[in-house]
């Protein structure tokens, strides 16, 4: 079994990462397995204290622990596009993209295992089958899913080279002065609060374009385009310029009078090259219920 480390797991100790994946296995058992060379990173034996880096590969035999396989769950999927190699799904707000920590049910991966159990890439490991990129739990919208590893690599390369275009809608706090612009600030993990990302000197290059669509008394409706894809990128960038995403309590917005499942943010547009062809696919979706309710309220008060 192999797990590809994503940015969200970077800076975790090796023993902590493995313990979080397998809640029924004690930390001591995990540490013993690491010490005895049963758990490796990139094919090499490491200490339990080894700090993981993005794209590290954590490797061990399937039978090292009594691992319970993920359940395939009959969760409705809103599929916006599908061909023989991939699909694009519209993830609702409130749903995890893939299992994390003790949460191993009700995720998009659980739903995908029911929809196409034998047709999902496994580059990211058993818990991230098919997942090419992710959305935060309370961000809704479009996600690409790969049915095989070649397609997974093809789509990830488009994200890496910035040829895949991902656009979002957000309502942000405050009235933005500029009609459009670019935020180019490096992002890294907040070492005091591992749930947060921050603007960090020496962090990863992070670029977000924004365009104002509508202004209200205390909020602004914006379109955002990711040029890079860091964890919480839009949320961190907008907070850094004094306009946190509405209801994003983690990044300083507080909860407004219009209560929602946290941040008012959705991935509404996705443009990419169809795998192994020259055909350009563009998919756009309408406002989700959260955004509709917020915009209706703000327009009624304007």
Mark where each language-model region is.
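RNA pseudouridine synthases
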Residues: 1-302
């Amino acid at each position: 079994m192999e797990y590809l480390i994503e940015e969200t797991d970077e800076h975790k100790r090796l023993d902590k990462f493995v313990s979080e994946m397998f809640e029924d296995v004690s930390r001591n058992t995990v540490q013993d397995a690491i010490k005895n060379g049963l758990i490796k990173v990139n094919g090499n034996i490491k200490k339990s204290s080894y700090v993981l880096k993005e794209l590290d590969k954590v490797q061990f035999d399937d039978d090292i622990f009594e691992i319970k396989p993920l359940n395939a769950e009959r969760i409705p999927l809103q599929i916006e596009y599908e061909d023989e190699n991939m699909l694009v799904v519209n993830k609702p707000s409130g749903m995890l993209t893939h299992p994390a920590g003790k949460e191993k049910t009700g995720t998009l991966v659980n739903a995908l295992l029911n929809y196409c159990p034998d047709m999902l890439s496994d580059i990211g490991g058993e818990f991230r089958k098919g997942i090419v990129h992710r959305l935060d739990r309370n961000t809704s919208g479009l996600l690409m899913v790969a049915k095989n590893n070649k397609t997974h690599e093809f789509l990830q390369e488009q994200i890496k080279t910035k040829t895949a275009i991902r656009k979002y809608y957000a309502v942000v706090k405050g009235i933005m002065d500029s009609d459009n612009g670019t935020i180019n600030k490096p992002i890294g993990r907040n070492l005091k609060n591992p749930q947060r990302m921050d603007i960090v000197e020496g962090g990863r290059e992070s670029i977000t374009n924004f365009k104002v669509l509508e202004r209200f008394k205390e909020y602004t409706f914006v379109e955002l385009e990711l040029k890079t894809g860091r964890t919480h990128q839009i949320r961190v960038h907008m907070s850094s310029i004094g306009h946190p995403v509405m209801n994003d309590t983690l990044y300083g917005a507080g909860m407004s009078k219009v209560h929602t499942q946290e941040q008012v943010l959705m991935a509404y547009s996705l443009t990419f090259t169809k795998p192994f062809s020259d055909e350009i696919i563009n998919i756009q979706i309408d406002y989700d219920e959260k955004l509709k309710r917020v915009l209706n309220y703000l327009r009624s008060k304007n």
